[in-house]
């Protein structure tokens, strides 16, 4: 019964992480807004910034990985390798989220020293979508940290319980 509960707990955690990464991916991909003032037209989209593209690619990789691991049989010998891949996915999410957060902060506040003006006043819907994608990405990251701890416990625990 305990093993079944652990298996279901891990499955629910993986499913939630998959959902959060997929949500971050979809919200970021659909972020686009066009604004016009005077004779100038401005279109903001995620492809304008390399950090946002990296965020999309990272969340796509994590989503595909999360989906595939959901179908891995519990008897598979690959579960020890899954722990390593969980760590890689956690690091990938961390780096992409931090890069996207830095760019989003500049978009929101600007940078007076560099002469960069904030754009969120002109394209608020775009900025709101970026914020939503970053929140979903942060949820995915937290879930992946928990998943990594869970995976480590599941793989290491049998070794600790063995009698010498």
From Swiss-Prot:
It is found in: Cell membrane. GO terms for cellular component: plasma membrane. Its main location: membrane. It is a multi-pass membrane protein. Keywords: Cell membrane, Membrane, Transmembrane, Transmembrane helix. Residues 1-7, 73-80, 151-164 are cytoplasmic. Residues 29-51, 102-129 are extracellular. The chain crosses the membrane at residues 8-28, 52-72, 81-101, 130-150. InterPro entries: CASP/CASPL, CASP_dom, CASPL. Expressed in the stele of the root. Homodimer and heterodimers. Belongs to the Casparian strip membrane proteins (CASP) family. This is CASP-like protein 1C1. It comes from Arabidopsis thaliana. The lineage of its organism: Eukaryota, Viridiplantae, Streptophyta, Embryophyta, Tracheophyta.
């Amino acid at each position: 019964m305990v093993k079944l509960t652990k298996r279901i707990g891990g499955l629910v955690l993986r499913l939630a992480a998959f959902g959060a990464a997929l949500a971050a991916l979809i919200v970021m991909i659909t972020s686009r807004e066009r604004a016009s003032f005077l004779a100038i037209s401005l279109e903001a989209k995620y492809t304008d910034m390399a950090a946002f593209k990296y965020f999309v690619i990272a969340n796509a990789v994590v989503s595909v990985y999360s989906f595939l691991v959901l179908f891995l049989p519990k008897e598979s010998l690959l579960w020890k390798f899954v722990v390593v891949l969980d760590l890689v996915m956690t690091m990938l999410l961390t780096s992409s989220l931090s890069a996207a957060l830095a760019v989003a902060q500049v978009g929101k506040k600007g940078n007076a020293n560099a002469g960069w003006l904030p754009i969120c006043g002109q394209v608020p819907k775009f900025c709101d979508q970026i914020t939503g994608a970053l929140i979903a990405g942060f949820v995915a990251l937290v879930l992946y940290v928990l998943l990594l701890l869970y995976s480590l416990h599941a793989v290491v625990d049998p070794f600790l319980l063995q009698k010498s």
